């Protein structure tokens, strides 16, 4: 009885030690099922492709969507963020992904309620959507647009998630796909102008972009001003006669 009472605690301790060791190595060995191991991508966003040459992502992008595709280009999943955490310059989006190579396709502005573009050829099943089928289309009215477009941003990044249990840090750089153009007219003789006396339009075949952000021909779109008016800009040489201008602002997809 005394020998048994000594052996049992030793056996118990041995089993506990074995369980602890197995728990420690289960996420690091290639011989075990790794589907439950924590790994993926810790993704930061950067929008410095602008005239300020600084990261304006926290100030300019109010919602972001990341579409994930595997090494063969098949759709894996989508991650959205629409909250105020995007205002934090240190914000990172966590993507839980198994080991492998992925393409991350990101759009800023699509998940916002006031968005001006739609994703087409997009389905929820990975077997149904390939990255080459992805397109973003301007929401227009019979190829006419006279609204201030909600800003659209684009970015793409290739990333590899290793087998070890960790989140790979990466940065996805974005560019802006919308423009706000202000046209100003002024008489050389200083006489006042009325904006309603003029017709302001911009035409371009630029309503659709593919997964590489290249413009795809879908037909000419006519852009009209979303606002017009007149403004005083100073006085003439006599110091009394006001000088005014007529202006119009148009919002377009990438030119």
Predicted regions and their residues:
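A sequence/structural signal for flexible, mid-protein segments enriched
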Residues: 142-237
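Short, low-hydrophobicity acidic/polar segments
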Residues: 77-176
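Bacterial Sec-dependent N-terminal signal peptides
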Residues: 2-3, 20-48
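Bacterial N-terminal signal peptides that target proteins for export
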Residues: 2-15
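Structural motif
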Residues: 47-59, 185-193
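Tryptophan-paired
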Residues: 64-118, 193-255
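Short coil/turn motif common to extracellular beta-sandwich-like domains
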Residues: 35-54, 176-180, 252
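Residue-level recognition of well-ordered beta-strand positions that form the cores
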Residues: 44-48, 67, 107, 184-186, ...
């Amino acid at each position: 009885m005394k020998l048994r009472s000594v052996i049992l605690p030793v056996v118990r301790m041995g089993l506990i030690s074995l369980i602890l060791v197995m728990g420690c190595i289960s996420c690091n060995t290639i011989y075990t099922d790794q589907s439950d191991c924590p790994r993926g991508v810790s993704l930061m966003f950067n929008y410095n492709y602008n005239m300020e040459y600084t990261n304006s992502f926290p100030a300019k992008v109010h919602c972001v969507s990341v579409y994930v595709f595997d090494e063969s280009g098949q759709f894996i999943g989508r991650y959205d963020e629409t909250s105020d955490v995007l205002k934090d310059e240190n914000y990172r989006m966590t993507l839980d992904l198994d080991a492998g190579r992925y393409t991350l396709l990101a759009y800023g502005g699509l998940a916002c309620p006031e968005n001006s573009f739609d994703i087409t050829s997009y389905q929820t099943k990975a077997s149904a959507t390939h990255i080459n089928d992805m397109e973003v289309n301007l929401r227009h009215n019979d190829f006419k647009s006279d609204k201030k477009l909600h800003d659209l941003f684009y970015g793409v990044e290739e990333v590899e998630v290793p087998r070890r249990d960790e989140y790979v840090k990466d940065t996805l750089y974005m560019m802006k796909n919308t423009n706000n153009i202000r046209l100003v007219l002024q008489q050389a003789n200083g006489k006042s102008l009325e904006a309603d006396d003029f017709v302001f339009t911009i035409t371009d075949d630029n309503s659709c972009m593919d997964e590489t952000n290249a413009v795809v021909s879908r037909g000419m779109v006519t852009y009209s001003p979303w606002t017009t008016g007149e403004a005083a800009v100073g006085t003439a040489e006599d110091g009394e006669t006001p000088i005014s201008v007529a202006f119009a602002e148009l919002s377009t997809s990438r030119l």
